[in-house]
């Protein structure tokens, strides 16, 4: 394994570990306040796993910055390509509303997956 790849893998593992510690100890005290599905911590874990620690952190920070009462809400998946302008999403726009199936026709309006 190349040194840079090993460093990236180690940083990603550390970041995922910190998120799991947050989910285990701090999140139960704060309650479920996230306005998005998946929750911000699940989103961050998936983004780091799929895109590595650097792009994953960028996506997680962008998502957490939108998670406030005046921000968006609803279903907001991790994009396939995190590079700006290539994810097929609007950077400043809100996520799809919770009752809508727009952008994900396989998802039911009650928030459950069809199977």
Swiss-Prot record:
NCBIfam families: membrane protein insertion efficiency factor YidD
PANTHER family: MEMBRANE PROTEIN INSERTION EFFICIENCY FACTOR-RELATED
Keyword Cell membrane on entry: yes
UniProt name for this protein: Putative membrane protein insertion efficiency factor
Source organism per UniProt: Rhodospirillum rubrum (strain ATCC 11170 / ATH 1.1.1 / DSM 467 / LMG 4362 / NCIMB 8255 / S1)
Start and end residues of each stretch annotated as Disordered: 81-115
Keyword Kinase: no
Reported function: Could be involved in insertion of integral membrane proteins into the membrane.
Membrane topology listed for this record: Peripheral membrane protein
Compartments where found: Cell inner membrane
Family recorded in the similarity comment: Belongs to the UPF0161 family.
Annotated TM spans: none
